[in-house]
Structure formats: C-alpha cells, structure tokens
C-alpha cells in the first residue's frame, strides 16, 4: 500500500502554483497515485553541496530561494551529498516554510563508517539497523519531522529483493518519519532489472533514474512499467553531463566533481556530435536548446519532475520557463526515437 496514512503524517500540500506566492512558468504534476504535487522542474541539490560547488553556503541558499521564487517546490538530495551538507542546506533554506516544499533524500551509502563512500562508490548498507540510523540523521539535518520521499540509494538486486529492507521502509512510513518511499538507481545509467522489480514487486512510489536524450536506455523501458504500477519516474542527469545544456563544449570543459568527470574524451566528442543532430528540436519551437530538451521529457506522463542540475540563477530561470513552451507532437517524439535507434547517424566512439 503506497498511500500515506494519517499515522504516517499525511498533510494537505499546497503547490506553489496555487499558493499565489509566485509569478512562475513552472507547472505541477501528481506523483503516481499519491497526494504529492511536484514542480515539473525539480532541483538536484548535489551540485551545490559537493566538490562540484565552489561557492559559499550563502550563495547556495540564495539559489534555493531563487528556485522557490520561480515556483520550484521539489528538491532532491542524498545524505551522502557533501556528507550531509545537502540536507543541512535544505534544512536551513526551508525552515520557515517546510509545508510548502517537497523534500526527497536518499540513504544507503555508509559514509559514517567508510570515508570512501561518496554516492558513486564505497560501502552500501541496507539492513534495518543502518537504515533507521541513517533516516534519523537525515531528519536531524533537514530539521524536519518527516521526509516526503525516502529513496534507497543505488540498491543492488540483493537489496531490492530483500523483504526486510522494504518492511523497514513500510514501518518508517507508519511511524510518520517518511511519507513515501522509492528507489534511486545507480551509479550511472543501467540497472533495468532492479528498477522493474522495485516498481512491480515493492510498490515504489518513485523510481529515480539517469536518463537523457543521448542515453535513453533502460530509462525508456521504465515508462511502460510505471504506467502499470503508478510509479513516478524522476529523471536525473537530464542534460547528459552538461552536453545538452551547453555547459560542456569539449573535453576541456568537464568540471571536477560533476557527472562528466567519469566520461572519456571520446564519449564527449561523440555526444557533442549527437547533440548537433538534435538541433531541429530547438528550431521547431523557436526556444533554447535546454528548454527543448526538457519539453521533450515532459511528453512522458509518468515523469512528474525533471531534476535539473545548475549552479547559475539565470540558467535555472531558463529551465523553469520550459513547461510553458509549445508541446511536441507524437511525430516529433517518434523522430527523436528513430534518431536514437540509429545512434543519431554518428559513428560509435
């Protein structure tokens, strides 16, 4: 049973669009069959709380305020991001208006005992004792009595199949510490079997997956399953490590601490060539390329929110304008799928 009960701290949620507090282009979607309405553009917190961030805490908090003013009500972090830094920043930013935002975090990487645990590698624990400990620590850092969406961080197939893990999550929901639970797949793209099992067998409210126009598998296979299971698919890395938002124009632009640090020069060059083959999606709507990319993703009805990554207020505002731009039609979406099937007519690296 996925719906939160009164005992689990169910609360009426007013979306930013309906609160009258924002002049915004952002729109809102319901997450599966829950009572959560999230902004179609959500904010990934890791770029503001890890080694990728070179600014101050005050500058990070200012970007959170900017996002909120733009109508963003959905913020996604992980306890391992900055070793708790992401959660602490969210706690400070929304201490006075907690009921107006939806906070998602992740647990699983045991950075408390393993200095090498960083959200990509290192020790992962999914036993009941650890999960409970990690959730309590996250609640303290977030300064809240409940987590809206708790995600199991990069679960192995063994973890996904472990009844005790999901029984622990259900118990935490009944205790009111979390409202809903899901899984965040990783590291990187892939993990098809884990995702399908979590949706079909574990009642995951959300499934977070790395997905972009250049890396559509296995993400696109999740959409059909999500329709059946009423799961919300949260898209991470929507700009393909900076290729699709213009952050990366060549191998030299790859920033330390970002997704693209794991990419080879050959991958970057191939990805840039593919991006060039997609220029028509911008021209067709007379919008910016990042806006076109986001609008294509919003074609999928199982996607309640796209978790954008940015450290720039102007870029964030550009992203938040995407939902109001003209819709793509079925034939255009089909053409993108055909280009992907042909590898965009670009030789493989």
Where are the language model's segments positioned?
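Active-site groove signature of glycoside hydrolases
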Residues: 139-158
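N-terminal binding-site loop/beta-alpha segment at the start of enzyme catalytic domains
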Residues: 6-105
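Active-site mouth loops of central-metabolism enzymes
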Residues: 46-58, 117-129, 158, 188
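Acidic (Asp/Glu)-rich catalytic clusters
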Residues: 33-35, 92-99, 139-143, 173, ...
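A short, structured active-site edge motif that brings together acidic residues
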Residues: 100-112, 209
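Short, acidic/polar
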Residues: 54-67, 126-142, 189-198
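Beta/alpha (TIM)-barrel catalytic core signal, keyed to glycine-rich beta->alpha loops juxtaposed to Asp/Glu
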Residues: 155-348
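Conserved, mostly hydrophobic/aromatic
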Residues: 31, 43, 60, 75, ...
């Amino acid at each position: 049973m996925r719906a939160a009960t009164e005992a689990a701290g169910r609360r009426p949620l007013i979306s930013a669009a309906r609160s009258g507090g924002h002049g915004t282009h952002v729109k809102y979607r319901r997450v599966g069959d829950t009572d959560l309405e999230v902004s179609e553009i959500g904010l990934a917190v890791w770029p503001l709380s890890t080694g990728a961030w070179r600014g101050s805490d005050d500058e990070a908090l200012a970007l959170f305020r900017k996002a909120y003013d733009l109508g963003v009500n959905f913020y996604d972090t992980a306890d391992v991001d900055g070793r708790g830094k992401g959660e602490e920043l969210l706690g400070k930013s929304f201490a006075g208006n907690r009921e107006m935002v939806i906070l998602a975090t992740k647990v699983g990487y045991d950075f408390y005992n393993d200095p090498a645990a960083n959200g990509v590698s290192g020790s992962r624990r999914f036993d009941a004792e650890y999960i409970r400990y990690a959730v309590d620590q996250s609640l303290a850092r977030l300064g809240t009595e409940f987590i809206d969406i708790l995600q199991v961080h990069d679960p192995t197939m063994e973890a996904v199949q472990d009844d005790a893990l999901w029984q622990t999550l259900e118990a935490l929901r009944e205790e009111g510490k979390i409202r809903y639970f899901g899984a965040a797949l990783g590291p990187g793209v892939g993990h098809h079997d884990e995702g399908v099992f979590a949706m079909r067998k574990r009642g995951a409210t959300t499934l977070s997956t790395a997905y972009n126009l250049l890396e559509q598998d296995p993400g696109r296979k999740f959409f059909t399953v999500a329709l059946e299971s009423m799961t919300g698919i949260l898209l991470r890395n929507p700009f393909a490590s900076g290729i699709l938002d213009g952050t990366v124009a060549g191998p030299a632009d790859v920033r330390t601490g970002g997704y693209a640090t794991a990419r080879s020069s050959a991958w970057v060059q191939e990805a840039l060539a593919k991006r060039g083959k997609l220029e028509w999606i911008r021209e067709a709507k007379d919008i910016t390329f990042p806006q076109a990319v986001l609008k294509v993703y919003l074609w999928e009805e199982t996607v309640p929110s796209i978790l954008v990554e940015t450290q720039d207020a102007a870029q964030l505002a550009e992203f938040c304008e995407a939902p109001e731009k003209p819709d793509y039609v079925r034939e255009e979406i089909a053409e993108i799928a055909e280009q992907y099937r042909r590898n965009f007519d670009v030789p493989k690296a």
